[in-house]
Amino acid sequence: MSQTETQDLLTIAGRDYRSRLLVGTGKYKDLDETRAAVEASGAEIITVAIRRTNIGQNPGEPNLLDVLPPDRYTYLPNTAGCYSAEDAVRTCRLARELLDGHTLVKLEVLGDEKTLYPDVVQTLAAAETLVKDGFQVMVYTSDDPILAKRLEEIGCVAVMPLAAPIGSGLGIQNRYNILEIVENAQVPILVDAGVGTASDAAIAMELGCDGVLMNTAIAAAKNPVLMASAMKKAIEAGREAFLAGRMPRKRYASASSPVEGTFF
């Protein structure tokens, strides 16, 4: 492990992580491919849709916990498929029961099936309820800086604005809003949704995001395991570029070689 990796950790809810890439576990052809892709990504936090993935709800069926053991990964149960605050809160409480008191959750409350944009009113309501109920909430939201700050003030441990619609692969559509959110946040900011390829992930990190969560960008690739590896490298490169500080943009050229002191 490099000195940079040792000193530059992602901290969420009081726990440190080396990897700034968080990955989903859906859309793979089988659990073996899921395991291989997660391992290639280097991710330490994996998110799971409680309403769609078996983590003990259905005894006798393949269980994600068998291929991605919770003593090796931090599970992040999410409320994918919920369209009301009530459903989201109920799903988080079910996850807490299934995972023996686990309180770190990813909250998402969707507005409609076409865009899968977050319903911000329902999201705010669910976040308030869950925080009061002792949950550590990582929240999926729009790229509205005011809303992001409000969710932070409610007590969410991380705010996760979308780059583009879920599963669209369009990349970051509004860099300036993401930058505004990052610059005013006191909690980790992770881009969630819309990443399509490695360069999208690198850009998010170059903007100063603390991490990126993705699923479809890896699972829907022609070679998911190879794409997972590419995303790992992109996250690391983007983070190092952010820490290094990019050169200022200039309108005109600037010669790389000095004019003074030439031989002729």
Curated annotation (Swiss-Prot):
Chain segments annotated as coiled-coil in the UniProt record: none
Residues where 1-deoxy-D-xylulose 5-phosphate binds: 167, 193-194, 215-216
Catalytic residues of the enzyme: 106
Assigned GO CC terms: cytoplasm
Metabolic or biological pathway: Cofactor biosynthesis; thiamine diphosphate biosynthesis
EC number(s) on file: 2.8.1.10
Catalytic activity: [ThiS sulfur-carrier protein]-C-terminal-Gly-aminoethanethioate + 2-iminoacetate + 1-deoxy-D-xylulose 5-phosphate = [ThiS sulfur-carrier protein]-C-terminal Gly-Gly + 2-[(2R,5Z)-2-carboxy-4-methylthiazol-5(2H)-ylidene]ethyl phosphate + 2 H2O + H(+)
Statement: the UniProt record of this protein carries the keyword Transmembrane helix: no
Lineage: superkingdom: Bacteria
Subcellular location(s) of the protein: Cytoplasm
Chief localization: cytoplasm
Keywords: Cytoplasm, Schiff base, Thiamine biosynthesis, Transferase
Pfam families: ThiG (PF05690)
GO terms of molecular function: thiazole synthase activity
GO terms under biological process: thiamine diphosphate biosynthetic process
Known function: Catalyzes the rearrangement of 1-deoxy-D-xylulose 5-phosphate (DXP) to produce the thiazole phosphate moiety of thiamine. Sulfur is provided by the thiocarboxylate moiety of the carrier protein ThiS. In vitro, sulfur can be provided by H(2)S.
HAMAP family in the record: ThiG (MF_00443)
Quaternary structure and interacting proteins, as annotated: Homotetramer. Forms heterodimers with either ThiH or ThiS.
Family: Belongs to the ThiG family.
Protein name: Thiazole synthase
Native source organism of the sequence: Thioalkalivibrio sulfidiphilus (strain HL-EbGR7)
GN (gene name): thiG
